[in-house]
Amino acid sequence: MVAYLNIHTAYDLLNSSLKIEDAVRLAVSENVDALAITDTNVLYGFPKFYDACIANNIKPIFGMTIYVTNGLNTVETVVLAKNNDGLKDLYQLSSEIKMNALEHVSFELLKRFSNNMIIIFKKVGDQHRDIVQVFETHNDTYMDHLSISIQGRKHVWIQNVCYQTRQDADTISALAAIRDNTKLDLIHDQEDFGAHFLTEKEINQLDINQEYLTQVDVIAQKCDAELKYHQSLLPQYETPNDESAKKYLWRVLVTQLKKLELNYDVYLERLKYEYKVITNMGFEDYFLIVSDLIHYAKTNDVMVGPGRGSSAGSLVSYLLGITTIDPIKFNLLFERFLNPERVTMPDIDIDFEDTRRERVIQYVQEKYGELHVSGIVTFGHLLARAVARDVGRIMGFDEVTLNEISSLIPHKLGITLDEAYQIDDFKKFVHRNHRHERWFSICKKLEGLPRHTSTHAAGIIINDHPLYEYAPLTKGDTGLLTQWTMTEAERIGLLKIDFLGLRNLSIIHQILTQVKKDLGINIDIEKIPFDDQKVFELLSQGDTTGIFQLESDGVRSVLKKLKPEHFEDIVAVTSLYRPGPMEEIPTYITRRHDPSKVQYLHPHLEPILKNTYGVIIYQEQIMQIASTFANFSYGEADILRRAMSKKNRAVLESERQHFIEGAKQNGYHEDISKQIFDLILKFADYGFPRAHAVSYSKIAYIMSFLKVHYPNYFYANILSNVIGSEKKTAQMIEEAKKQGITILPPNINESHWFYKPSQEGIYLSIGTIKGVGYQSVKVIVDERYQNGKFKDFFDFARRIPKRVKTRKLLEALILVGAFDAFGKTRSTLLQAIDQVLDGDLNIEQDGFLFDILTPKQMYEDKEELPDALISQYEKEYLGFYVSQHPVDKKFVAKQYLTIFKLSNAQNYKPILVQFDKVKQIRTKNGQNMAFVTLNDGIETLDGVIFPNQFKKYEELLSHNDLFIVSGKFDHRKQQRQLIINEIQTLATFEEQKLAFAKQIIIRNKSQIDMFEEMIKATKENANDVVLSFYDETIKQMTTLGYINQKDSMFNNFIQSFNPSDIRLI
């Protein structure tokens, strides 16, 4: 047997368990000369199939299984490409099927693409004669060995192969159950799904007509198609007046260079070099295309990032507006982006604000045509955790067992079932019974198979021809996709550009828009000063919550130690704070603060490493060192850098000799050459592209600038981006309060779905209120825009439709203070809800009928709700306090220590808090303990109560009260938590503090005369405490006398002072 003509691979999603590599391996073992891939309706697997076959000297045949219909009957059909034209026909046929979601193919559609195909009808019966007869003039039409005889039609033996061996039949049933969302025991007749890969011995045992087998070879020999890689498929840019792209590009570049206030001669020299490299490689159209779409974005209110990746190292990119990073100013290398000695497609990735990215994609589609632009397919796979749960589900495991499985497989990226099996608890689960062992066996066979398709997050393919001429297409959720992955499409030669959506650009754009609208200030982010000391003070304090690249706890810690003073410090931090180079951070900080400690292996390293204090941080530095010492061109230096990062021993040894020889010819001793090579080899693994670091540091700086100068607008927009996450919202509210920003309750006449900045503070989003959905907010805001602000609560009730105006909505709005601006207490408005809901307040408001038919609404004024209840409702509906936290409300004036004021060094200092969360757990020894979250209204702190303390204080933790806690700080993973040693209710603490006071200090003597009889000149007994007066104006303490704690007037004396005017010691 020399060929298999009907292989269904795992890319026939959930229909086959046969991986391409396994199909090829089996073919090799059986001395098969040719394989045909024939997945149903799709060509997903073509590139991998082609590569695997060629690598193993097997002839690849490209085909597809379809279902052909005449409207009445349907016949399974295999179509095979005879040549490259047939291959293109397959692309288009599959594209037609997938783009139009066709289950069946009409014989008319098949005829359109059949000239260069071999057609094999399967299991043809009498009812299919009409379909077969349509193709009677088609010379390469066959029927399979299970079909009836039809005059003039040859038969061929063809076996649908979709799993490896006979023992793997259960995989097809399992895949069918997963696909159909049913139970495994409901799937029957596995034979209908296909067969295993038959061995030559098994085929010989079958009673097959020899002529049928002969036709297999005939068909295999007729098929001769191949995938063509690295084609020149770049689209051509339409220039004005049909000017050549080269001439037009040069004219645009020189014109732009003359506009800029730069050293013309220096920049022109660099420009000529880059232009020559680009045009010699034939990439002039590419740069013009990218420039055009970025120009569209910038002129259509879509914010574009300053650059991404190595493209910021190109002066051409800078002059075309593709980047806003001057590569000469920042000492960036063009060869890191485009290497003239290693011809590859340039890779320009573009960041757009995420909320408007689709506008640019739509522009590209309109410019080039719908069939000329597509996204890129990606595949989700049955990885360990997913396959374990899927197979458990179809085998009928209950939810408890499924959850047990999930808990037994670690949350580790890329973990395999074999790795999980090394864990004792997982192994015990597998061998608990025969059912579990069968479950594990099926899981192992399905692990790694593609399960579903999705869309690549960023990649867009563009061509000036319909894309199905070069690759098959399918339909995704938001448009067309190539059926091949990003790397496969690029290997063919198609132009791929990454259109990435960056949330931080949306935040910046929104801030700029609001500042211009509200304050009349037009901020040009290209003209802001990049040496603003207030920005560097913010960074030095680590106040970088919400700032791109700088908001993790680890980076904040580094910033506090480093104390950035200039932009280069930000670039360095964003490059160093990654696995690998992190170990150099202490060295960098030490040298940054004391440059005398900088040491260089050789003086010629100083010009290259001076800005980074002798530490190699950037890939460009490695290239510069190779150029300086070994006289490498930057192209050669980039090849060296790539070789070092890939750690290919043979290539590395060759490059080492190349480097040492070059250094020798350049006048360096062999010993120092070897040391320099070893130095750059050490850092090559994690050197960071400086061009990318500069680009992203610019975004970080811009956000820092906006946070410093427009904090209300900054925090409002950061908060708007975390709507829906109660935890993140509470964290950002907490951070904003720490910065002194007033958080205002939702205001029915000011608030939107998003947070609204104002001069007074930030209005909370109406969408933050639990139980108030987006549609309700939309109705409220739309009504306000169309008919003006609401005059009062009853006006609101009249204008909002009944379907929205529910008791639940009204109560929520009232209890968070959304109507406070109308001057009525929340309790008064709660009382008015019945009037609103009982009366018909949605009568048409035009004309006097409204006045006659609408009953007069009256408020029944009530006293305001108690402060504690107001705070409780705000916490319930918003997840945090707005009016005032209980800690703030009553006790900050007494100068208690709070989390916000607590330093890491203040162990065992009593602090005033509420317990936000108490999570009780049981230790391995069966003892109870708890993890808690403490809150003081401004900041939260994680705490832990170990078993001994938990026994003492468990009962207290059930009370919603204010507490004084103390303990010791523990620092892990750069986060602090308090190991709690003691807990007291505030009331108990106050009593004890009063009972044991040794001195009373007052700051206001206005009440003193009322208690003159209590004050004694000298101490007479143990119950007497010192009474002192502290004069703030002269900063002096005076002893007034003594008072007796047992005196009947003592408590009255204490209560007569404002909390801020008295202190007990």
Swiss-Prot record:
Keywords: Cytoplasm, DNA replication, DNA-directed DNA polymerase, Nucleotidyltransferase, Transferase
GO cellular component: cytoplasm
EC supergroup of this enzyme: transferase
Assigned EC number: 2.7.7.7
Known catalytic reactions: DNA(n) + a 2'-deoxyribonucleoside 5'-triphosphate = DNA(n+1) + diphosphate
Gene3D superfamilies: 1.10.150.870, Bacterial DNA polymerase III alpha subunit, thumb domain, Metal-dependent hydrolases
MF annotations from Gene Ontology: 3'-5' exonuclease activity; DNA-directed DNA polymerase activity; nucleic acid binding
Annotated localization: Cytoplasm
InterPro entries: DNA_pol3_alpha_NTPase_dom, DNA_pol3_alpha_thumb_dom, DNA_pol3_finger, DnaE2/DnaE/PolC, DNAPol_HHH, NA-bd_OB_tRNA, PHP_dom, Pol/His_phosphatase_N
Superkingdom classification of source: Bacteria
Name of one Pfam family that matches: DNA_pol3_alpha
GO biological process: DNA replication
Family in the record: Belongs to the DNA polymerase type-C family. DnaE subfamily.
Free-text function comment from the UniProt entry: DNA polymerase III is a complex, multichain enzyme responsible for most of the replicative synthesis in bacteria. This DNA polymerase also exhibits 3' to 5' exonuclease activity. The alpha chain is the DNA polymerase.
Subunit note: DNA polymerase III contains a core (composed of alpha, epsilon and theta chains) that associates with a tau subunit. This core dimerizes to form the PolIII' complex. PolIII' associates with the gamma complex (composed of gamma, delta, delta', psi and chi chains) and with the beta chain to form the complete DNA polymerase III complex.
Name of the featured protein: DNA polymerase III subunit alpha
